[in-house]
Design a protein with these regions (language model features):
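Conserved beta-strand signature within the Rossmann-like core of class I S-adenosyl-L-methionine
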Residues: 115-123
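Conserved N-terminal segment of class I S-adenosyl-L-methionine
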Residues: 1-82, 121-122, 128-147
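Conserved helix-to-beta-strand junction in the class I
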Residues: 110-113
């Protein structure tokens, strides 16, 4: 992600503008966006959901170092958060790794209300020479997701 610094900066600015109240950070990796949201006065609490325990532990360590650990909860699944509706959902660079991204979007819809904000992106492309081998780019999956 070193080559992605401008992109990361842009997504941080975007979430700074729109994130508020109860935030779900889904698949947040090393936690840059979750930690930035935790530092925002507009955000009440961030629920960092990642299936990777190493990621969760690392972000928890970073949160403690930054003094924002009280504004974050770390969970393996959305259900573990015990929150029925989120005000903001952040899901960046995750959907292209899922076997059924359309189903995940439907799951997000269930935990949003009409005033919720969603910050999503995706990159359904394995690359010219398979540079992104873990990205889904099967045309049937992408068409189901996009249409």
């Amino acid at each position: 992600h070193i080559t992605s610094k401008d992109y990361i900066a842009d997504t941080l600015k975007l979430q700074q503008r729109f994130s508020r109240d109860l935030v779900l950070d889904f698949g947040g990796g090393i936690g840059t966006h979750a930690l930035a949201n935790a530092m925002s006065s507009k955000v009440e609490h961030v629920f960092f959901v990642d299936i990777n325990e190493t990621n969760r532990n690392f972000v928890e360590y970073r949160a403690k170092k930054l003094g924002v650990e009280k504004k974050l909860t770390f969970c393996k699944t959305i259900k573990d958060t015990q929150i029925s509706k989120f005000d903001t959902i952040v899901c960046l660079d995750v959907l292209e790794h899922l076997a059924d991204p359309a189903s995940q979007i439907n799951n997000f819809n269930e935990i949003m209300d009409s005033n919720s904000i969603a910050l999503f992106n995706w990159y359904f492309y394995k690359g010219e020479e398979n540079e992104y081998p873990f990205h889904v780019d099967d045309i049937k999956v992408v068409e189901k997701y996009c249409y």
